[in-house]
């Protein structure tokens, strides 16, 4: 189940994270212990995750048990108690543990800081993690849940169930979910900015690699096709084991570089993440920046054709993966302003030409860059040194 209750919609900093960690605690009909025991007895797995736009509540189970888990998900959304003692004894400590774990994960920390710097911590720039410096009350969590947990804010997605079966479950189990209004967020405003922080491991030792993120405002989800192709064209990974890959970023020596595009409802971030020893990051960042500039000048039709094929594979994987309910792209298309099919999305990618990719790269470079530097910051570059 996807709920339109990501961090961009939260009424107070951290309440979206708190609701995520409240998932599968006591409801009006079931205690937290009963929920866990029944899931174990049925061989099921329950999980919750959070993005900037959505909260995901996922149940994985054996075929034949769908009625039980559909009832449970509906109860978690529609009849949650948000008990004070569970908040104080379980949720608050888990919030601190999540934040501490994220602080030790350079990728999680870097992406969160990048959005915060780019959007000044507002809307989509709101952190996915509650901060100890901004304490949350259980009353604030209840108030946000009352706004978010209603039928207008949820989408039910399944993998392995027929459409008719899913409709039947929705019409029987989810009638208990209260009616309400869909949450609305203020339009996103990109500012651009920088974040730099020394980063060590949990024991205070230097990490083997420093991390540098550079990004520009990208495109909204509805207009993301050219940038999705540009992301695939720049690449950074490999599709074949023991091969360095053919993309420009995969050719950078002594560093790992990867392009990314995080497309949201009304904005997006397109950028490159570099992981390398401190002394190698600056050169790798310059090479990556040159690759983006080269794409803005011109790209070959052959490269674009290859990138389109890669982008289409990634999109299909998002739509049809085994844990489809946990994919942002599916939830966004169901809960966004206009739903779209996989076929129409693939057609959009197929229509992208070389000129479209170059134009998209040119538009990026006209904007203000954002950057995040983690590690030995004295040796790490600034975005304005690269563009």
Q: Where in this protein do the model-derived segments appear?
A:
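Cytochrome P450
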Residues: 5-12, 103-107
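His/Glu-based metal-binding/catalytic segments typifying zinc-dependent metallopeptidases
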Residues: 2-7, 146, 153, 179-251, ...
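Active-site SXXK
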Residues: 14-25
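An N-terminal structural lobe/cap that precedes and organizes the functional/catalytic core
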Residues: 1-10, 29-32
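Charge-rich, well-structured scaffold segments of protease-associated domains
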Residues: 28, 32-189, 212, 218, ...
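A short, flexible beta-alpha/helix-coil linker loop
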Residues: 6, 20-21, 55, 236
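Hydrophobic (often cysteine-bearing) scaffold residues that line and stabilize catalytic clefts
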Residues: 11-15, 69, 226
